[in-house]
Amino acid sequence: MTTEIRALYTRLPAIDRLLRDPAFSPLLAQHGHSQVVAQLRQMLDEAREQISQRQTLPDWSHDWQHACEQRLTAGQRSALRPVFNLTGTVLHTNLGRAIQAESAVEAVASAMRAPVTLEYDLDDAGRGHRDRAIADLLCQITGAEDACIVNNNAAAVLLMLAATASGREVVVSRGELVEIGGAFRIPDVMRQAGCQLHEVGTTNRTHAKDYRQAVNDNTALLMKVHTSNYSIEGFTKAVDEAELAAIGRELDVPVVADLGSGSLVDLSQYGLPKEPMPQEMIAAGVSLVSFSGDKLLGGPQAGIIVGKRALIAQLQSHPLKRALRADKMTLAALEATLRLYQHPEALREKLPTLRLLTRPAEEIRRLAERLQPDLAAHYADFAVSVAACQSQIGSGSLPVDRLPSAALTFTPHDGRGSRLEALAARWRALPCPVIGRIYDGRLWLDLRCLEDETRFMEMLLR
């Protein structure tokens, strides 16, 4: 070891001396002795490593208190950070899907602050059922006899199959054996539920006779799966829910449907493509219908099953129900969201998902044109332009449909793609990260989901 390197090691402070420094008192008070000591030990290890490898001290070594504070503060930052979702995907799975309505946020906060009547009946001072209040709401909205709530729609499908068809056959069209994100496949779910898959028809064409011919003494269910994340077009044929329900009644076999996204309102009245609605399935005679809470419904992550009272009772009494049940925060948010549907005239205003999906393209374009001059002046190395674009709903909902929108695009004057990557990384490192997408040599910020204009500009003009 040379004299110079030995001198560098001697400049490293002892942890005890640092802790006695008055500058560290606020850190000790805020983060505690253990965390501060652990952070200082890590910093000392880094400094020793740099001396060994590069024969220099780290740049931060002139102010140990400041460096330690920065690291501790960064370490305390929540893993679930608010971001600006300007990707063009409204219900972005990686960004948490539906934004909750204010009433849902307030309901969750209230449920977290105090004991609540989750499973307590105030009328007779006995044990109640956690799904009861929401089940009543869902029955009012959908016309179902009863309802069951679990923690997501994958769980809803699993419970529905396990409780009503374990050890028996479930008949499904080959064209509806879907896979959604995260490798959730209908055949795999059936296997986990203990069911036997009985495929009928072909990928593009399935007829009523295919279902009739498939039914046997071991048939438990006829199942309809909404292909929400893909579309088969051209020479096609499918049996709709009403016809399948009629076949089920004729052969005395229950019919169940997995809608995936599930919308409780007719989206076509807002100028959006129509999605199948649970109440339509119930009216058609389907025995059980499952759908998501955090997609088109605009609520928290939840799996909702509505349908016949006797079948719902089977689900509620199945051992899996306890493992899959929703907690009080989910139920509070879901109840508040469903109550918004009781006042449909105000739904578009109060439900963020519907508000964002129905936002007029011209309004978004005016927003982009208003922001463009200041951003163009600030980002001199880029051509900042307003461009028409197409948003998508996301989360497997209406996969082939697009929503006209407007974006701010950033194109480097020197044409170097590395500048786009660097700019995107810079925005992701902001206190409130800005998430866009790189496409066609430009960084796009689709403004459909931008509502806090002031905060957004504070971030980008830093």
Curated annotation (Swiss-Prot):
Subcellular localization: Cytoplasm
EC number(s) given by UniProt: 2.9.1.1
Domain of life: Bacteria
Purpose of the protein: Converts seryl-tRNA(Sec) to selenocysteinyl-tRNA(Sec) required for selenoprotein biosynthesis.
Keywords per UniProt: Cytoplasm, Protein biosynthesis, Pyridoxal phosphate, Selenium, Transferase
GO molecular function terms noted in the UniProt entry: L-seryl-tRNA(Sec) selenium transferase activity
Entry's Gene Ontology BP terms: conversion of seryl-tRNAsec to selenocys-tRNAsec; selenocysteine incorporation
NCBIfam families: selA
Family in the record: Belongs to the SelA family.
Catalytic activity: L-seryl-tRNA(Sec) + selenophosphate + H(+) = L-selenocysteinyl-tRNA(Sec) + phosphate
Residues recorded as bearing N6-(pyridoxal phosphate)lysine in the entry: 295
Cofactor(s) this protein requires: pyridoxal 5'-phosphate
Chief place where the protein resides: cytoplasm
Cross-referenced InterPro entries: PyrdxlP-dep_Trfase, PyrdxlP-dep_Trfase_major, SelA-like, SelA_trans, SelA_trans_N_dom
One Pfam family named in its UniProt record: SelA
GO CC field: cytoplasm
Record has Transferase as a keyword: yes
Pathway membership, UniProt: Aminoacyl-tRNA biosynthesis; selenocysteinyl-tRNA(Sec) biosynthesis; selenocysteinyl-tRNA(Sec) from L-seryl-tRNA(Sec) (bacterial route): step 1/1
Protein name: L-seryl-tRNA(Sec) selenium transferase
Subunit structure: Homodecamer; pentamer of dimers. Binds only one seryl-tRNA(Sec) per dimer.
